[in-house]
Amino acid sequence: SKQPTYPIDSKVVTTVDQTVHPVPVSSTSPKLLPTEISKYSQYGYGLWQAGEGMALQKRLDIMAPGFSGAEARHEAKLLRFFTISDIHVSDKETPAQAILYGAKGGVSSAYSGVMLYTTHVLDAAVQTINAIHRKNPIDFGLSLGDTCNSTQYNELRWYIDVLDGKVIDPSSGAHVGTRTVDYQKTYQAAGLDKDIPWYQVLGNHDHFWLGFMPPDDYIRQALVGENIVNLGNLFVDPRGLESRGFYMGSIDGSTTYGDVIGAGPEKAFVIPPKVLAADPDRRSLSKKEWIGEFFKTSSG
């Protein structure tokens, strides 16, 4: 059957036309934890408004001293290209992540509500690129790395498949909520316009676990298992991935707002917490394997 799509607004603008500004949260609103997504709208969190556009900057600093362009008599377009970076397509249901570090604020890269919709955000960005391309053709695109959040095969395939315009199943493991939870539902990605070639760079999150630790055997095995990883404070503990003491948490994909599960001190759990199901597609990729997947694409 035909899968749903998520078309963007027909009016597509750039920062030359307008900018985006957050609406200040009322002083009477309570402070919310990042995980309290269900209360964001009620208390005025996450709202934004349009602001004035920004003029394009002339990079005269790369020209000869004293150059102003005043003597120029002819204009010509050299290249027109797009860049995307730090997309962090995330398997929010994986047992090997670090949600605990960000669930109460402080480390937004460890937890953010946007984790539920990373493939959808990328799909919207691709549609925006296509719309701009139709107005004024783009020569090529550059993706500058941190495509994935944590070296996982399924994260990389989601990324490539969104660019290729494939059907996207944004869930993993038990694939719960695929009929009832918005962020879990299968959908048809728009795909990047086939006339735009694109080039890829490897980022730290693409070959390090969470961007800063080479995955060891414990992490590699945890990724394809059910047990939520048990780690210490990786920021200060010299034992690194060999440290223990805290379960790092995961997301329950059967819940409307992506409830955090299995996060907290080891002593708070009678039984070690688990995700709903293991998934071999969560496996960690080596650099060679990661690069190899880009030869399995129908775009670019």
Feature-to-residue mapping (PLM):
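Acidic, histidine-bearing metal-coordination/catalytic regions of metal-dependent phosphoesterases
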Residues: 1-140, 153-201, 206-299
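Acidic-and-aromatic substrate-binding clefts and catalytic sites of carbohydrate-active enzymes
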Residues: 148-151
